[in-house]
């Protein structure tokens, strides 16, 4: 117990750090957002009239920005995102770099597009290199997480170089266990709970707004928790200018991990404090699993990873014990892990919706002690071992990322 409660290296302090590192407010898909942030930071060091902006990124960042809506525009494209970030983005906005986008700047953005070049390289980890040229030259690098400005170089002079190994962040998360998470949520810190409350407010609001709109996937599905999840994701992917609380680098994961336990708890008239603990459980389980799969991967995080988190939370709300919560996670992962990520887009709404339905089903099964047996495929008896196997299987899917880019945007 003392290891959990005391000291800066205690499990409690580690969970706090993990939470605040992985739960942040954003406008729009986080990959165009990250590119936009690099541009906004670079602009602050630029002198004179802009000549060019060159951005080279890892292939997963590129994949996720091709077909997703840019906030406030309903339009697609990295060149547009870069131009808008240059015009209205501010470094202090962080992942909210697009929050000032409006129709009046669109025409100016189109005038800048000829000065913008975008390409990608076969890097497995999140890595964005943005070079801006005017009377001087500025280089900005983002690595490992969407708002980690790791390098700033102005006219060859290094202003910042804070390279942090992606393995350090992963190892920090891997140093805790699901049991540590279960213990923490029963006595969470107040500032953590306050962020959870914000996440509930923003993400449920997005779902409620989306489900009202004809043409939205959630509107078409009509009712039920999966429909609301689809509605929120579709709002975001379609380019609505709405704030979303991200989880482990993804707004869709934020919606898929926060909305289901919230609506389940409220439908069953549970106390808000209990719902907040459940949502925190969902967030932390999702973040924990993502430490093994990686931030950007060939695997659909909203459909298969966040749904494991929400199933844990729903099982908790329904009175499940620790073993049943773990079995719910295992049931989801053993069923949906093969769902791939073929880029951020409106169709993500349906993947998240399917994941949510499975989260509900997995919880029902776990509560009746009816679970996928170990040895069925990659399912292990211990969910922690299943998660470790997923880490290995994710790496085996890397060829998918290389091939799928050729199809995105082509009918």
UniProtKB/Swiss-Prot annotation:
<dbReference type="InterPro" id="IPR021144">
    <property type="entry name" value="UPF0597"/>
</dbReference>
<dbReference type="InterPro" id="IPR005130">
    <property type="entry name" value="Ser_deHydtase-like_asu"/>
</dbReference>
<comment type="similarity">
    <text>Belongs to the UPF0597 family.</text>
</comment>
<dbReference type="GO" id="GO:0080146">
    <property type="term" value="F:L-cysteine desulfhydrase activity"/>
</dbReference>
<protein>
    <recommendedName>
        <fullName>UPF0597 protein Fnod_1278</fullName>
    </recommendedName>
</protein>
<dbReference type="GO" id="GO:0019450">
    <property type="term" value="P:L-cysteine catabolic process to pyruvate"/>
</dbReference>
<dbReference type="Pfam" id="PF03313">
    <property type="entry name" value="SDH_alpha"/>
</dbReference>
